[in-house]
Amino acid sequence: MEKNQKINNAAYDQLNKDADRILQLIKVQMDNLTLPQCPLYEEVLDTQMFGLQKEVDFAVQLGLVDREVGKDLMLRLEKELSKLHDAFTNV
């Protein structure tokens, strides 16, 4: 049972790292490259979020992450991205 918990924790940690990586990528993009209204920005964000959602779905299907935990992770990232977007557009 302990081995399963380690695997579950590792899966969740990796999903969190991927979510943080997306947030950092978007921060860099907003700071250096494009505006939030730019189609390139939207394309990168949509692609990254889609990929992370598929990772979460896969982890849930394997029983590595609880469905609610996966939803919470996605909601947390969406809220952080929304705050970042608001901060950038309200400057």
From Swiss-Prot:
What's the superkingdom here? Bacteria
Q: Which cysteines are joined by disulfide bonds?
A: none
By its UniProt entry, which InterPro entries does this protein fall under? UPF0358, UPF0358_sf
Q: Which Pfam families match?
A: DUF1507
Checking Gene3D superfamilies in the record gives: SO2669-like
Protein family according to the UniProt entry: Belongs to the UPF0358 family.
- Kindly provide the name given to this protein in its UniProt entry: UPF0358 protein SSP1677
What organism does the UniProt record list as the source? Staphylococcus saprophyticus subsp. saprophyticus (strain ATCC 15305 / DSM 20229 / NCIMB 8711 / NCTC 7292 / S-41)
